[in-house]
């Protein structure tokens, strides 16, 4: 679910009925509208995405951050100091707030794209983002199949993502701890 501060009462009410909430910030709140993060984004919108995600994590409402690297979705082959900085801020906020970072299998199901260097990659999970996560030993990580069809529950792509995590020496949690 998205986070918007004007719905704080609603999030608090939900938490009386469920064990935890998952943050999946798919849209940014602009002055008079919402902006779909799956569209082309500018660096200013990427910073806004990071600020909204960090604000949400700081509320304590969320236990999992879904596809934390979604901000780079349209630019899988762009990685620079700004992307590194933004990613570190998100990762560190997740650690500070005891929030799991989700490696999202559905991103891998979108298929392989070519990087500028000519190698095969996914739009997400994003290799450079998860390399950064591997530097943070306190980061909590889960893999989520993000099933939109029953056939996706534990498919070959899910196995590929587990292998991806293994190659990066990411310690993937089997259970959510409260």
Regions found by a protein language model. Give the residues of each.
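Extended substrate/RNA-proximal surfaces in nucleic-acid metabolism proteins
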Residues: 1-97, 102
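Charged catalytic cores and adjacent phosphate/nucleic-acid-binding surfaces used
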Residues: 72-73, 78-178
């Amino acid at each position: 679910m998205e986070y918007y501060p004007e719905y704080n009462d609603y999030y608090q009410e939900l938490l009386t009925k469920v064990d935890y909430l998952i943050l999946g910030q798919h849209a940014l709140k602009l002055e008079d509208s919402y902006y779909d993060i799956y569209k082309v984004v500018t660096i200013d919108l990427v910073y806004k995405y990071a600020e909204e995600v960090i604000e949400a994590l700081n509320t304590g409402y969320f236990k999992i951050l879904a596809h934390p690297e979604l901000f780079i979705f349209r630019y899988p082959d762009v990685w620079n100091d700004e992307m590194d900085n933004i990613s570190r801020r998100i990762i560190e906020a997740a650690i500070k707030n005891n929030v799991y970072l989700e490696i999202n299998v559905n991103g891998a199901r979108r298929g392989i794209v070519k990087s500028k260097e000519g190698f095969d990659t996914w739009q997400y999970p994003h290799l450079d983002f998860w390399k950064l996560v591997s530097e943070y030993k306190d980061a909590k990580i889960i893999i989520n199949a993000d099933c939109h069809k029953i056939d996706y529950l534990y498919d070959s792509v899910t196995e590929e993502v587990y292998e991806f995590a293994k190659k990066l020496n990411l310690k993937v949690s089997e259970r959510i701890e409260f």
